[in-house]
Regions:
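A structural signal for conserved, well-ordered secondary-structure elements
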Residues: 1-719
Length: 719
């Protein structure tokens, strides 16, 4: 590449980054409720109300569901223009209203069935909506052939009788139609209507006629809704969540960039600029595709940064190895990118499988995490394989050609990992056994092996900020009695949220009135600011489905990963050992949840699948090197040959495994240190999982492959 061309390419990349950075800064500064150029925020970031209803009627019609959604949307629009109402499955409706203050009042209002009234000129009611059998918008022509838009009404027998009497006595007068206190039509009686069918004319478009017909039908609906799940997040807590998460991301990114530059010099500079571009691209993509950002979504973005670093580390390690063989820097860069491609693609595709499974089987915040993780994987591939490549080539062409600026892989004596496999297997067995014993003890003493959250058990959880540090004794003496008095529940669980002045209270499922009374009691007797109170209720139906979905997500993702690895490596032993290592990782993560008693909630499955994706990515990089080294060894391999190849491959990829683990760990540590309580509950097992994933890739997966290769299959090695 000529110096002039390199200068132009670098200038274009820097200009593109400057534009993206400016664009991203506008988006971030505008992000909030009601802003035009902003990323939609989930309720956990903006504060607000979310409630999911189950239709009581069996097999509701599509029209009834549509009418009910329309009715609820009309109601919630008065609270927030950002509110949304949408259908879930065949018989559920979810309402989300961000940025509201009096959440309980809204929940109570949404629970009312609404009313449709036909009024006399003096305002007295002569007929209600339940006397309307049907209402449909239609298009007809008048006697002159002009198109007109009407609403055709069909009344019940009782309604037809009343309507006939009233219209006979009020010819030439207007009879208002009122829905929920608002006049939606003001038709004039042209003549007595006694046949049970009527027409309302005067609409300017079919849409206007159809909307009026829908509103009239709504008033006559008998659909009953029962609350399945609700969540209330104070706006203050939402604001704290987004600011702390963004701060964690910025600091973590800066630390990772410094680490990359110190470790890799010129390639580290290229990677840092590519990482900055990656981050701005993620922000722009979220905005352009109108993807709702949640707390786990932010975690997905930050984890994606770690994945982007991993791709760069693989490339740079390959470049150093080629330089060590005596090749020029320019040739080494070309070969390094080529050799790194298969490992990067395979690793990211398997992680992508985990995110797709989450999108398909997850819901709510878990699905938001899956979207951001998938975006992160795709963009990390682009920035690592395209952006980093062009930056690196340009820096080289501009004069940074010294081998010292790129590094040279040192020849290391192979470490005998295979010889220590019994030790590694024993360590893992002890850790997993500790988790199983802990689960057994807790199951016997508490009735549940893990600290299941509402998502898996059902009930009501209320979190409030008491403004002071409280001991367990303080909570038991000063808070629990008030809760027991309001709820009549002697089995109240109150726990302190570590690192904060918040307390989480878990009870049986409370009614709306009980929730309001509990919040009022805490505010009056414990000096709690109502804006800091967050509550969530989940029925046993929803919690049962979440447990089922969690299990399905893990099983389905492992099956697809198994098939993909089998297809790519053409050897079931690679796939089987990788999946067994993943099972090991999942069991270790469950052990962490069991020992530390972290709440097992909706983000548990996101955490598990993230670790699965990360671990399989690490394992595939090592397996890719084993595959490469196997190809160099002609003839039938003996057990000693396989041992040598496995140890050599592990040693060659060891620095890459350590460095990529460090960079990803940095991002998650920042989340844990600076994030709010729910993010910390997500980050702690994630940190343990990252350590475990790196350990299993180095000390479990390859050792399992060696055992299978030596002892099982048609092409097993000779001893």
């Amino acid at each position: 590449m000529k110096k002039s061309k390199a200068a132009v390419i670098l200038a274009v990349i820097i200009a593109a980054f400057a534009g993206l950075a400016y664009y991203a800064s506008i988006i971030l500064s505008s992000t909030g409720i009601g802003e035009d150029m902003s990323i939609p925020l989930g309720l956990d970031l903006s504060g607000g109300v979310s409630i999911t209803y189950q239709v009581v009627d069996e097999n509701p019609s599509a029209e009834d569901m549509s009418d009910t959604i329309y009715k609820l949307q009309k109601r919630v629009d008065s609270y927030s223009t950002e509110a949304s109402v949408y259908q879930v499955g065949d018989d559920r409706i979810t309402v989300e209203i961000p940025g509201v203050q009096d959440a309980n009042e809204i929940l109570e209002d949404l629970g009312n069935p609404g009313s449709l009234e036909f009024q006399m000129p003096d305002g007295s009611v002569f007929m209600t909506g339940d006397m309307v059998e049907d209402a449909q918008g239609a298009t007809t022509t008048d006697r002159y052939g002009n198109k007109q838009y009407i609403v055709s009404l069909k009344l019940t027998d009782e309604g037809a009788k009343i309507f006939g009497e009233v219209t006979s006595e009020n010819i030439g007068k207007n009879l208002p139609i009122v829905y929920d206190g608002e006049t939606i039509s003001y038709p004039r009686v042209q003549s007595a209507i006694t046949g049970g069918e009527a027409q309302i004319t005067g609409m300017s478009s079919f849409e206007e006629a159809d909307n009026l017909a829908t509103q009239i039908r709504i008033g006559s609906l008998s659909l009953q809704l029962t609350e399945l799940e609700s969540s209330v997040v104070g706006a203050q807590l939402g604001s704290q969540a987004i600011s702390s998460s963004l701060k964690a991301g910025a600091i973590g990114l800066a630390v990772v960039m410094v680490f990359m530059i110190v470790m890799y010099a010129v390639p580290g500079i290229a990677a840092s600029l590519a990482l900055a571009i990656y981050t701005t691209l993620v922000i722009a993509t979220l905005y352009l595709f109108d993807i709702t950002l949640t707390l786990p979504g932010i975690a997905g973005i930050i984890l994606g940064i770690g994945m982007a670093v991993d791709a760069n580390v693989i490339v740079f390690a390959r470049i150093r190895e080629e330089i060590a063989t005596g090749k020029s820097v320019q040739t080494s860069m070309k070969i390094g990118f080529q050799k790194a491609m298969s490992a990067i693609l395979d690793g990211n595709i398997t992680t992508l499988i985990a995110s797709v499974v989450l999108m398909a089987l997850g819901s709510g915040t878990v699905k938001g995490f899956a979207y951001t993780l998938m975006i992160g994987i795709i963009l990390s591939l682009f920035t690592a394989m395209v952006v980093t490549r062009y930056i690196l080539y340009s820096l080289y062409a501009l004069g940074l050609k010294s081998e010292k600026l790129y590094g040279r892989a040192k020849e290391r004596k192979s470490i005998d990992f295979i010889g220590k496999k019994a030790v590694f297997f024993t360590i893992s067995g002890i850790i997993i056994a500790a988790g199983l014993i802990s689960m057994g003890v807790h199951s016997a003493t508490e009735g549940k092996a893990l600290n299941y959250g509402l998502d898996f058990m059902g009930g009501t959880s209320t979190t409030a900020d008491f403004g002071k540090d409280m001991t367990i004794e303080d909570i038991e003496n000063d808070i629990v009695p008030y809760v027991e008095k309001v709820t009549g529940d002697s089995d109240v669980q109150a726990t302190k949220v570590e690192g904060t002045t918040q307390v989480t209270i878990k009870t049986r499922t409370l009614s709306l009135d009980e929730r309001q009374e509990l919040e009022d009691t805490l505010a009056e007797n414990c000096d709690v600011d109502a804006s800091t109170i967050t509550s969530q209720s989940i029925s046993s139906t929803i919690s049962g489905e979440m447990r089922s979905d969690a299990l399905k997500a893990v099983i389905v993702s492992c099956i697809f990963m198994l098939l993909y690895i089998w297809f790519r490596f053409k050897d079931i032993r690679f796939a089987a050992s990788a999946i067994l290592a993943l099972v090991h990782d999942v069991l270790v993560v469950i052990t962490v949840y069991a020992l530390v008693r972290i709440s097992v909630g909706s983000t548990f499955i996101a955490c598990v699948l993230t670790i699965v994706g990360y671990s399989i990515n690490d394992t595939i990089v090592i397996f890719d090197r084993i595959r490469e080294n196997l190809a160099l060894k002609t003839g039938k391999q003996t057990a000693e040959d396989l041992r040598e190849i496995a140890n050599k491959s592990l040693t060659q990829t060891l620095s890459r495994s350590i460095n990529t683990s460090i960079t990803t760990f940095i991002m998650v540590v920042m989340l844990y240190i600076l994030g709010v309580a729910s993010i910390r509950d997500f980050s702690l097992p994630l940190m343990a999982g990252l350590v475990c994933g790196a350990y299993s890739s180095i000390c479990i997966a390859t050792e399992l492959w060696y055992v299978m290769k030596v002892h099982f299959g048609k092409n097993k090695a000779t001893k």
